[in-house]
Amino acid sequence: MKIKKLAAAVISVIICGAFSQTAYCEDDAANVNVYPSEDHKNISPYIYGVNSGVDLNTVSAKSFRLGGNRMSAYNWENNMSNAGSDWKNMSDMNLISSAAEQFRRVPGGAALNASYEAQNGNVPYTLLTLQMLGYVASSKKGQVSEDMAAPSEYWKKVVNRKNGEFSSEPDKKDNYVYTDEYLNYLIEKIGKSDSETGFKAYALDNEPALWHSTHSRVQTEPLKCSELIEKSVDLASLVKETDSGAEVFGPSLFGYSAYDSLAGAPDWAELKAANNYRWFIDYYLDEMHKAESESGTRLLDVLDIHYYTEAKGECGERSCGHYDNDGCVKARLDSVRSLYDENYHEDSWITDTGAEFFPLLPNIQESIDKYYPDTKIAFTEYNFGGGDHISGAVAQADTLGIFAKYGVYFATIWSFDQNEYQLAAMNMFTNYDGAGNGFGDTLVKSECDNDNISVYSSIDGEDEGTVKIIITSHDLHNETPVNIKLSSDSRYADAEVYALYGDSTEIHRLDDISKIKDNSISIDIKPLSVTEIVIHSDKKSAVPVIAVCAAALIAVGAGVCVALKKRGK
């Protein structure tokens, strides 16, 4: 997928109150005020990302991660990996089964293929997961039983430093897999982090708090907090020694109980009491900060967590697919609020046990400010469900808006079997017109008086001449009249309107707004939808729909359904 680079722009987020569970009147209008020159805040483009397995011809992504449980036991020398509890502790060639042919029989094929995919998809930021578990799959295929646990012939020991000469062809007959040789090999093939093709960052493995469960053939007992720090410091130091410009992500916490206590790590209670930590994230940040003080090098650039909503719908199930149940759909839309809204209490086991660290983002930032200032935040896996329904698109759009508002640096959605609506929502931020135009990098001030919608506003660079506004509607059945006032010295003339709604993943181009008076717009927003309004300060001829569709095919590929149909309401 080849598209134009995302132009520098300015983005604004305003969440219009708490998303109520009650129904809304049909004439419940929303009044939105946008102040393009006020309260600017930078936004990272890398929040618009995906994990491997997503067809990059279907989404204009800005970041890409190669991760997941299999990467913990990935042997770069022969491309074998072990699935752990995900699939019968099977060792096989799964990670390169769909790789480009040229990478299936060479060392590091999974990593090289990830770089190749990202380059073909015009994705500027790539993150590679490194192995910290301790052992990786050997050359022996098949199910690994309990009596074949490491150390055994079914595994190769991972050693960070070879302390010897690197080889362009790793020795597959010894009993070790060397991480420094792996990094050197990748740099020789695709370059360092400052090159176009090199990995920009490395993750310190994947979900270590679950190793004793997901990879019980290697890690038989729950990991101690102190063990994780020791492993993390050693591997992070190696990364910085090898490629000083690369960013380090860690510790890839799988969910709430990992944030809290590293999922009940054996030494957590003692460490918490001795240091008055609130949760494991405090300890991890503090220890990595101490490691920087000792080494003179920052060893953790980005705090890496995973988040899958635990909120239950009216049916009592987590992230259900009961789209004909209004209560279940509303629960999905509301669940995003656990990231930021102190007045929201989701229906989940987390709330039942106190939900001490909700809302999540303010609590994370508090820990960063106290224990390791300037650490960035990443959600390298997340999903709010509904990938096959418009509610999933609305939840995804709100998630991206919240990531923008709270300064998240990097985010890559982990897609399930169905992801079309979620990817379409991402395209509303990165490629709404099929020609590569999207949102950018700074918040501005907005205000709204209606609980039923969320509003995200943007300008290009520092130029108030074009204002872009995304509105998400949480009303399941009725249109919402929205009155928009732009408080700016610029005089606005016309606007384009794009929308994602109903039973289609197409981004539709609706009727243009041809005349704007007194910097005010009134528009009816479709129920359960994502709408983008692109407002121009001077009269610009509308691009013919045929030309836009042709540009979409060139920019995103013929396989992408970004149908810009000019329609009425």
Regions found by a protein language model. Give the residues of each.
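Noncatalytic carbohydrate-binding groove/subsite architecture in carbohydrate-active enzymes
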Residues: 177-190, 217, 225-391, 396
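Glycan-recognition and catalytic regions of carbohydrate-active enzymes
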Residues: 389, 400-468, 494, 503-506
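N-terminal substrate-binding region of glycoside hydrolase catalytic domains
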Residues: 31-181, 203, 208-224
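C-terminal membrane-anchoring or membrane-association module
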Residues: 556-569
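Mobile, glycine-rich extracellular loop/lid and propeptide segments
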Residues: 117-120, 127-137, 166-190, 198-231, ...
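Short, hydrophobic alpha-helical membrane anchors of single-pass surface/secreted proteins
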Residues: 541-551
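Carbohydrate-binding surface patches
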Residues: 450-491, 527-534
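C-terminal beta-strand-rich structural cap/linker in extracellular carbohydrate-active enzymes
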Residues: 514-540
